[in-house]
Amino acid sequence: MQFEEAYKEVYEIVRPKYKLFTAGPVACFPEVLEIMKVQMFSHRAKEYKQMHVDTVERLKKFLEVEKGEVLLFPSSGTGVMEASIRNGISKGGKVLVTIIGAFGKRYKQVVETNGRKAVTLEYEPGKAAKPEDLDEALKKNPDVEAVTITYNETSTGVLNPLSELAKVAK
């Protein structure tokens, strides 16, 4: 109940004109707005380096990452898509793109714009990807270098069964 009361206080301060069902913008607590008034330090400064290391370590614990890495990107989601394709897929390489909404379509566009080939596994809006369909698509395209899956497709409100899909994609 305490959180709801605090959120109500913030809501009263910013009182948005419209309800946005997106990842942002969001209402901020007054304490956060106060901290945001402080001058930011450079991403090349030692303070940033320490903050980055601390943040990665905290995220590893929070996300229960025992193997692998946590990567932070100072960009939009599209920037992350582009970085993953440019750095993870060979020029002319093939990517299997699952499409269940606008963000899957964007990934396909990013793949093709960056000189890679996109093979799609597309569903009608409101439907999640199916592991058996992914398995079939991978058998038809054994030369794909990567599979893209939008976990939470906010454009349609669909959550993909990521654990099941990941087992097939491995």
Please place each PLM-identified region on the residue numbering.
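Active-site phosphate-binding strand-loop segment of PLP-dependent enzymes
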Residues: A129-K170
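N-terminal "arm"/small-domain region of PLP-dependent enzymes with the aminotransferase-like
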Residues: Q2-K46
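Short beta-strand segments
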Residues: P74, T98, E122, T148-Y151
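Conserved N-terminal alpha-helix of the aminotransferase class I/II PLP-enzyme fold
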Residues: I35-A83, A102, R106-E112
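Generic structural signal for well-ordered, non-membrane alpha-helical segments
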Residues: P25, F29, L33, R44-H52, ...
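Alpha-helix C-terminal capping segments
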Residues: I85-K91, T113-N114
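Conserved PLP-anchoring active-site segment centered on the Schiff-base-forming lysine
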Residues: G88-K105
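Active-site-proximal loop->helix
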Residues: R106-K117, E124, E132-A137
